[in-house]
A protein has these predicted regions:
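Hydrophobic alpha-helical scaffolding
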Residues: 154, 180, 184, 188, ...
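N-terminal leader/targeting and assembly helices and adjacent pre-domain segments
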Residues: 1-169, 293-294, 301-374
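Hydrophobic/aromatic-lined pockets within catalytic cores
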Residues: 147, 151, 169, 173, ...
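Short, glycine/acidic-rich hinge or "gate" loops at secondary-structure transitions
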Residues: 154, 158, 176, 180, ...
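Acidic, glycine-rich two-metal-ion catalytic cores of nucleic acid-processing enzymes
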Residues: 184-292, 300
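Long, charged/polar-rich coiled-coil alpha-helical scaffolds that serve as structural arms
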Residues: 159, 163-166, 170-175, 192, ...
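Short hydrophobic/aromatic-rich motifs at helix boundaries and adjacent loops
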Residues: 136-137, 178-179, 199
Length: 374
């Protein structure tokens, strides 16, 4: 079977749940810290005096998160790599080269897994470094803003605190920028990084297995509702070697056992395609071995009534559901909690309508949870 990023999505989701739980815990910590002694005339003074306690609690959450995710990521990478390798075995199992691959008893490529684990550590290190500072700085700003707002507007301290907490919950812990310059909140950034690195592990397991049996070409699937980044590579043949750019090669016909040759148009290298955006987070394309004379181009899948823009509207609704769930976690009283819950239900109803109106869409409840990547 071909390999695709989707092969490792469940592994990334399991790690993402750790970030999801941490994000909820941090919002609740902040809300409880602000709510304590909220009726006291010395509220602002007491809040500033308790910053040390809040910092300690946040650091405990961040340390526990890092310990849990380090081991979980390593296990996910090994599993993803093995899945990619087994996909190559399943794909070629009926052929002589497939039986040769299946007979090999090969452990995961330790250097490859180590390299990916190090890359993941580099990508997520800013998350742990920023958590404590972001939460404590937000706490200071809210205390200062609430004190000033009361004097200027006359609204209650609880109302002002809730308004500030709602704004923070809408944004999440922000300030994380990926290689493309896009800004992410903490949980979304971390899960995006996990999804990317586990997808890479699955693909590397697959291409390492192909390299062992000297298969040097792969072909990209034709996925419905593709994005502009992937569209140029759909159905194209790519080399696992270093050659770049479109070129044509003549190769032995596998069906004729090498007695004849066939012309193969190669669109570029896999490295080149990935650098251009193929297999980005959320990519639904797959990659299969290309055997001259055996492999045919994938069929096109029409999607009448559903467009790529409809998939992006689904992503937008998912973000709004997550936003209001964060507002639930940040609620300081029952009134705010009830209002946020009503908004969650309203956007969930809109999601049901949107999916029902577009037959090619499938609802993904896990992407509506706090902490799911965008």
């Amino acid at each position: 079977m071909p390999v695709s990023p989707a092969m490792a999505e469940d592994l990334a989701r399991e790690v993402g749940l750790l970030y999801q739980d941490a994000e909820g815990a941090l919002l609740e910590l902040l809300a409880k810290a602000l709510e304590a002694d909220i009726e006291s005339p010395r509220w602002a003074e007491l809040k500033l005096a308790s910053i040390g306690n809040l910092r300690t609690a946040v650091e405990q959450v961040a340390d526990a998160l890092q310990q849990d995710t380090d081991g979980a990521v390593r296990r996910a990478l090994v599993t993803a790599y093995n899945r990619g390798r087994q996909a190559a075995v399943a794909e070629l199992g009926a052929l002589d080269i497939g039986r040769e691959l299946a007979a090999r008893d090969t452990l995961p490529n330790a250097p490859a897994v180590d390299r990916l684990a190090a890359s993941m550590a580099d990508d997520t290190r800013p998350v742990y470094q920023r958590i404590t500072r972001a939460v404590v700085d937000t706490y200071r700003r809210i205390v200062s803003r609430v004190s000033g707002t009361q004097l200027l507007t006359g609204i209650t301290r609880r109302q002002a605190s809730q308004r500030a907490m709602d704004q923070f919950a809408n944004r999440g812990i922000t300030g994380f920028v990926d290689s493309a310059g896009r800004r992410w909140d903490m949980a979304s950034y971390a899960e995006m990084a996990v999804r990317s690195v586990t997808a890479r592990a699955a693909i590397e397991g697959h291409i390492d297995a192909l390299a062992e049996i000297r298969v040097g070409l792969v072909i990209v699937s034709d996925a419905p509702l593709e994005c502009p980044l992937c569209r140029p590579w759909e159905g194209e043949i790519l080399t696992l070697g270093s050659a770049t750019g479109p070129h044509t090669v003549r190769l032995p016909n596998e069906l004729a056992h090498g007695r004849t040759t066939v012309a193969v148009h190669v669109a570029g290298s896999l490295v080149e395609a990935r650098a251009a955006g193929l297999f980005h987070p959320n990519c639904r394309h797959s990659l299969g071995a290309y055997l001259p004379g055996v492999t045919t181009r994938p069929p096109h899948h029409p999607t009448p009534g559903t467009t790529y823009e409809d998939t992006q509207r689904q992503r937008e609704i998912e973000r709004l559901i997550r936003q209001w769930k964060r507002r639930q976690a940040a609620a300081m009283d029952e009134q705010a909690r009830t209002r946020a819950n009503a908004k969650v239900r309203a956007w969930q109803a809109e999601m049901r309508r949107h999916v029902a109106a577009h037959p090619e869409l499938r609802r993904k409840p896990q992407r509506e949870q706090i902490g799911s990547a965008r």
